[in-house]
């Protein structure tokens, strides 16, 4: 099995770690937004997102990356009456609009200052410029000035089944493939089979109140060139799980397009959010139909690298849709307390997407028992009071995976722990003699792998030590070091300054600030004990050089690329107006990037010339 298959197997068998969940989400986002293939169903993705608790839906596209002119958020999801009622209390309205949640490619069409542009959603902040496709969707019609439309690019089910079903797994994968295709590979007949369906009209300035949804619909209908998504108007007494589930089935059966839920919107004016998900609208999703009752036999508590306990709910083996299921994720301690899940509880269970075991309700509460020697961390999690063997092994394993040390698995670390290797520091100081318990040949291989890890980038080391806490890995640490080359010489960090770094949001900034003192201690320990021999992010010449975005063509020398990152230069995969210098291996070679750089006046330097000027 390749890495993706291994992650999927672990996810579906509830043996996946938090770090692996992040990797799986990144891969799922990549496949969903950039390819014609999906590795998780919508239900499976929703469950993964719930397990991670905090997630950014979407993935930066691989072609024609560009900053989006407007924030294109996703939607919070609700599944039951309790969640619906909580939302209704926050967003009161006389009328609610129920739209089909179409399963296509989300896009934005915008006419600002009489310039018509189109973009796919990407990750909400960075998307793909698809302005060259506008003429295929709205023909000769023009959107009024200072107006934007959020739309779905989609294909009719009938058209897909007649013409493309043999080659694509589902309609959405076909649409994604057509939209993300390079201009020179466009097939006009395929584009002509796509439909553009509007679901939000945005007026400028965007920081002022937007019109209510019914008014938006009237305006869009007057434009007379674009179809609005199918909708119904209801009052709040009909906003129940049962009524919406029936409505979903009805609308899905009658829909010309694939849909994967309902969108509920309060019919009131609203301010568009500039980050996160909108408050005036939510998505209603229907869980799988194969729901069974099951009795809980016991709760298994597993400790992770940070000492946090993750519960696994074991049940009397129960068959769901032909597969016997015996355990489910319990998310966290507070989840079990709130739901009343413990030994003897009768729970309602299903397999989301016919794959992932999922608890969807509780019919009868049970008795919850906790592990020994725990304490509360925050509002929902419990942690170990004393560091256990299991926790230390997972810490070392996380380090091994972060710095890419081959040949070392959990069983290897378990054996080392039993022979006195009880910390990352001791692991890094292992001699070949210490490793002889694995035999002369394997001991030499493991020793050499550990020694090579000393040369890994410092951001990998800090990620391996979990210096800034869970979910802050090498990518975000690298952003920090690029912004602050002397990071660990600073007394403290300002959360507002951190948020100004592209790629770091307010929650991440707060976590970095909270962990900064501990991260400094870890960093100083690494340096003082000579556990690191790689390149530090020293300020050297970059303090006197104005940093900028560069593009590299004709060479992917890993040492040079790493040095660019270390010095704080931002790498672009393509020539854009924000690129200042194109770095080439050979000045005489006229590539596509060289031609484009010349056409827009971007400076072109050879690798050696760039080093001489900026390093």
UniProtKB/Swiss-Prot annotation:
Belongs to the NAD-dependent DNA ligase family. One of its GO terms (molecular function) is DNA ligase (NAD+) activity. Keywords: DNA replication, Ligase, NAD. This is Putative DNA ligase 205R. Pfam families: DNA_ligase_aden (PF01653), DNA_ligase_OB (PF03120). Transmembrane segments: none annotated. InterPro entries: BRCT_dom_sf, DNA_ligase, DNAligase_adenylation, DNAligase_N, NA-bd_OB-fold, NAD_DNA_ligase_OB, RuvA_2-like. Its EC number is 6.5.1.2. The keyword Ligase applies. It catalyses: NAD(+) + (deoxyribonucleotide)n-3'-hydroxyl + 5'-phospho-(deoxyribonucleotide)m = (deoxyribonucleotide)n+m + AMP + beta-nicotinamide D-nucleotide. It comes from Invertebrate iridescent virus 6. The active site is at 101 (n6-amp-lysine intermediate). SMART domains: LIGANc (SM00532). Catalyzes the formation of phosphodiester linkages between 5'-phosphoryl and 3'-hydroxyl groups in double-stranded DNA using NAD as a coenzyme and as the energy source for the reaction. The keyword Mitochondrion does not apply. It comes from the Viruses. Coiled coil: none annotated. One of its GO terms (biological process) is DNA replication.
């Amino acid at each position: 099995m390749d890495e993706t298959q291994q992650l999927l197997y672990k996810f579906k068998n509830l043996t996946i770690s938090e770090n692996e969940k992040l990797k799986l989400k990144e891969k799922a986002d990549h496949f969903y937004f950039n390819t014609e293939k999906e590795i998780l169903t919508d239900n499976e993705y929703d469950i993964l997102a719930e397990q991670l608790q905090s997630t950014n839906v979407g993935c930066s596209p691989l072609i024609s990356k560009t900053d989006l002119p407007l924030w294109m958020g996703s939607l919070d999801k609700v599944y039951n009456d309790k969640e619906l009622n909580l939302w209704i209390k926050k967003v009161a309205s006389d009328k609610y609009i129920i739209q089909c949640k179409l399963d296509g490619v989300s896009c934005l069409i915008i006419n600002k200052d009489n310039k018509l542009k189109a973009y796919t959603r990407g990750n909400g902040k960075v998307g793909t410029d698809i302005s060259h496709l506008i003429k295929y969707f709205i023909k000769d019609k023009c959107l009024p000035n200072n107006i934007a439309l959020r739309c779905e690019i989609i294909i009719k089910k009938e058209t897909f089944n007649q013409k493309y079903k043999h080659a694509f797994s589902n309609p959405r994968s076909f649409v994604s493939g057509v939209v993300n295709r390079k201009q020179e590979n466009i097939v006009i007949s395929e584009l002509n089979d796509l439909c553009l369906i509007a679901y939000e009209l945005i007026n400028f300035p965007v920081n002022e109140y937007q019109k209510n949804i019914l008014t938006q619909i009237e305006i869009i209908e007057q434009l007379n060139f674009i179809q609005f998504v199918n909708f119904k108007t209801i009052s709040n007494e009909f906003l129940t799980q049962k009524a919406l589930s029936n409505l979903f089935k009805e609308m899905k059966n009658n829909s010309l397009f694939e849909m994967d839920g309902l969108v509920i919107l309060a019919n009131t004016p609203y301010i568009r959010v500039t980050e996160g998900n909108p408050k005036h609208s939510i998505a209603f999703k229907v869980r799988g139909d194969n729901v069974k009752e099951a009795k809980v036999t016991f709760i298994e508590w597993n400790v992770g690298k940070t000492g946090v306990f993750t519960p696994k709910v074991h049940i009397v083996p129960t068959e769901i849709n032909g597969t016997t299921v015996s355990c489910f994720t319990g998310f966290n301690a507070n989840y079990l307390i709130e739901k009343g899940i413990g030994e003897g509880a009768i729970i309602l269970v299903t397999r989301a997407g016919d794959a992932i075991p999922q608890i969807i309700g509780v019919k009868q509460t049970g008795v919850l028992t906790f592990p020994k020697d725990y304490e509360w961390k925050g509002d929902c999690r419990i942690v170990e009071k004393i560091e256990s063997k299991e926790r230390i092994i997972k810490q070392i394993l996380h380090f091994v995976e972060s710095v890419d040390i081959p040949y070392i698995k959990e069983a290897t670390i378990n054996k080392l722990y039993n022979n006195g290797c009880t910390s990352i520091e001791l692991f890094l100081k292992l001699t070949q003699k210490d490793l002889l318990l694995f035999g002369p040949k394997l001991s030499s291989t493991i020793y050499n792998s550990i020694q090579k890890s000393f040369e890994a980038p410092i951001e990998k080391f800090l990620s391996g030590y979990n210096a800034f806490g869970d979910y802050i890995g090498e990518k975000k640490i690298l952003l920090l070091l690029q912004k602050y080359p002397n990071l660990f010489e600073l007394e403290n960090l300002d959360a507002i300054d951190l948020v100004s770094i592209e790629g770091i949001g307010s929650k991440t900034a707060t976590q970095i600030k909270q962990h900064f003192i501990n991260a400094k201690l870890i960093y100083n320990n690494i340096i003082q004990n000579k556990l690191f021999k790689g390149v530090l992010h020293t300020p050297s010449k970059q303090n006197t050089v104005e940093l900028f975005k560069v593009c590299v063509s004709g060479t992917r020398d890993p040492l040079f690329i790493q040095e660019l990152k270390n010095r704080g230069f931002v790498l672009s995969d393509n020539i854009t107006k924000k690129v200042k210098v194109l770095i080439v291996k050979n000045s005489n070679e006229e590539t596509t990037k060289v031609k484009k750089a010349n056409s827009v006046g971007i400076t072109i330097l050879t690798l050696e010339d760039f080093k001489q000027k900026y390093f």
